Amino acid sequence: MRGGIEGLYPLETTRFALSLPLLRSGPLPLTRRGWRRFPEGITPQFRSLGKFGEKNTKGTVPIVWFLLTLQAFKQFAEMTKSYEEINEKIRKGKAVVLTAEEVSEMARTMKPKEILEKVDVVTTATFGAMCSSGAFLNFGHANPPIRMERIEINGVPVSGGLAAVDTFVGATDCNPQNPTYGGAHIIQELIDGKELTLEAWGKGTDCYPRKHIKTMISLKTINEAILMNPRNAYQNYNVAVNSTDRTLYTYMGTLLPRMKNASYSSAGELSPLLNDPECRTIGLGTRIFLCGTQGYVVWNGTQFNCSKPLNEYGVPMGNARTLALMGEMREMSSEFLRGAYFEKYGVTMYVGVGVPIPLLDEDLAHRVSIRNSQIDTFIEDYGQKGDLIGKVNYEQLRSGEIEFMGKKIHTAPLSSLYKARKIAAILKDWIEKGQFELTAPVRPMPTGTSLQGLKDLNL
């Protein structure tokens, strides 16, 4: 058997053939039960196989057909990979890693099966405005201690509703007297190593007698600094236009009257949840790139919506799934976390997120092959109570101009494609160098969810 059966087929094929439990060293007639173990597509003549080497007489099949059938069976078996197999390749420096843009280009000439054979991990990324972001801080106790009930950092009111010296700095927190500066800027400045003014008040109790404190804080002086973002990395998002005669100032930026511009916010084919739209590899415990360091998916994001319609490529259109993310602020870089102010809207925070997608099977290889031309989203009129008035794909949006309702409309992204590409490349480099291994979710994302709305009791 050193060279395979009669030297006709390689040893690998021979070993595969002889390893099948239904085969024996003697005659090879198959029972009906044995026949049913083979998938559709196996040649029917296999039923009448005789002994090894028997000539093709009286309905029997020569051994060449037998081996071809076994080879076909081997090819029909679906190729899969496991997290451990991929991580072992990462540890050995042998993992093949591509960015989502690179694999989308590869998919122009390769089928998902070929991509699965060649690629182990695909890196995805986004860098956009994410208002539902913030940070938990613990300041430590003074002597005598204070139970902080009203807290300001650099003049910005932040939450005093936690424990005595804990707070949550929301990205959109701001001082009404200075609306262009807020929580997002505080978080960025702490990451940059700056000292900020902390002032707090309490009513005074027997165990916390102090009623006021004013001091300076930085990441070096406080205990914990944890970035905690309840809703980030939207799967998709509607394009914003304005059909009215006046300029609108929104979280989608400034919308000019009579549809003179269209604003969108997604990294398109680079976006994490567009490359794994059913969250097969993304769930509680998934390790990610977060603002320059390693962070984690800690839950589904708020407003997680599985009920959005799908286009012909299986891509959710509009505001669909989201992620809740957490990471250590002391390890982050303000290159990938920036405070921002949108005119006449308010403060927000740009957050850099990168998610690795392991190619476990052909379905995932197919999903990560998505291209901008295959990703549709709705056009929403912010001047008419959010009416959905059309749809467009990201290839059209990226061109800088779309034609809609007889008009040529200039398009501009709120998110940074440059930063998203940089994040995907950094994450790719981490994985290739063995500095970042993949984690399987310990809890999957929910399915079948939709959104509730508020009812106005005055109506």
Can you name each region flagged by the protein language model?
Residues 1, 5, 42, 61-64:
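Short hydrophobic transmembrane-like helices used for membrane targeting/insertion
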Residues 1-3, 32-34, 48-52:
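Glycine-biased, low-complexity coil/linker segments
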Residues 10, 39, 47-49, 67:
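Short hydrophobic targeting helices and cationic amphipathic motifs
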Residues 13, 51, 55-58:
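Polybasic, lysine-rich low-complexity intrinsically disordered segments
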Residues 76-89, 94-459:
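Anaerobic metallocofactor- and corrinoid-dependent redox/one-carbon enzyme cores
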